[in-house]
């Protein structure tokens, strides 16, 4: 990635696999013993299938219900990377993935797209993914790799042309902030009512703004949260916990 602090490793090297996966005190096994529930594999496309298979097996030996989720931005059922079709969902690799297609569909819909296109996008994922994968998707609206949801839902196209200093200090004007907040509530409702696990990027629930990395990674706004938005997210969490249908019910889109 051109970042000198990130080491380039050979994932097929035996000593590296022992350190990360196989040894009794490997990274994967040690943290599972200490209470981790599973692992999210950053940029799963960069990891060989054989490496993911060994990691999955080692995690299962340590904790039978360990969850292995991959960062895949596209439809992971037919992903091709480095000219090879990946086998993520053919058993023994990923339990599920980050649901970037849902995120893309939400923003497309709320920024002027059609409900039909949103439904088609979700039906495509449902048809392509195994049921257990679909119901364990990591449903995201914001992540550390994307501009803040609130910013994306209120910014104009021209404002993306601002220089780095302008983007670093940008805040939505009051009129567009109100529109963006309404859209974010709609996005959250969709996120919390779709099959999968709604996953909040810290600060989104508090109304945090910011363009792309590093402006989307500021510290949490302790003492300056949008209390109305925070209460809205808390209520969504309560409803999600109370209504089992939202976790394992069937999904059906209806024309109105």
Segments (PLM) and residue ranges:
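Active-site-proximal helices and loops of the catalytic beta/alpha 8
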Residues: 27, 37, 42-137, 190, ...
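Surface-exposed helix-capping loop/turn segments at secondary-structure junctions
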Residues: 35-37, 197, 241-251
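Substrate-binding/active-site clefts of carbohydrate-active enzymes
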Residues: 1-34, 55-61, 78-79
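The substrate-binding groove and active-site-proximal loops of carbohydrate-active enzymes
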Residues: 2-21, 36-46, 103-115, 168-179, ...
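Carbohydrate-binding surface patches
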Residues: 253-256
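Short clusters of hydrophobic/aromatic residues that line enzyme substrate/ligand-binding pockets
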Residues: 9, 98, 149, 220-222, ...
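Substrate-binding clefts and catalytic carboxylate motifs of secreted carbohydrate-active enzymes
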Residues: 122-212, 227-228, 242-243
